[in-house]
């Protein structure tokens, strides 16, 4: 049985060390941030809900890494890795979790 490699036109099946490093950093950042947010939530420091994606870091970072500038992302929960890979800053993430008007959702999330 021969296995054929299927590669979408214009895409590579290979990742550079730099791309792999960016994906790893996104995964690690997701885990650290969500661990901290959960502690804050359980301690009553966050008024909204937290929907962590613990255990799903690779999926989200991989999706984000595979997207280009033309792709539209409309995430809801457990999508922190996609946000980070698409360039959302940790400051923007924090502003959103704390419901600040300067955040991406203007405090309405």
In which residue ranges do the predicted regions lie?
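Conserved acidic/glycine
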Residues: 1-59, 65
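Cofactor-binding active-site loop characterized by glycine-rich and histidine/acidic residues
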Residues: 35-38, 45-109
């Amino acid at each position: 049985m021969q296995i054929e490699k299927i590669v979408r036109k214009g895409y590579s099946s290979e990742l550079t060390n730099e791309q792999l490093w960016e994906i790893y950093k996104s995964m690690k950042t997701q885990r650290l941030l969500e661990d901290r947010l959960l502690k804050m939530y359980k301690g009553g420091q966050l008024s909204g809900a937290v929907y962590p994606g613990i255990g799903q870091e690779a999926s989200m970072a991989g999706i984000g890494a595979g997207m280009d500038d033309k792709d539209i992302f409309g995430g809801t929960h457990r999508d922190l890795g996609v946000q980070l890979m698409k360039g959302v800053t940790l400051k923007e993430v924090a502003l959103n979790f704390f419901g600040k008007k300067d955040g991406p959702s203007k405090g309405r999330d």
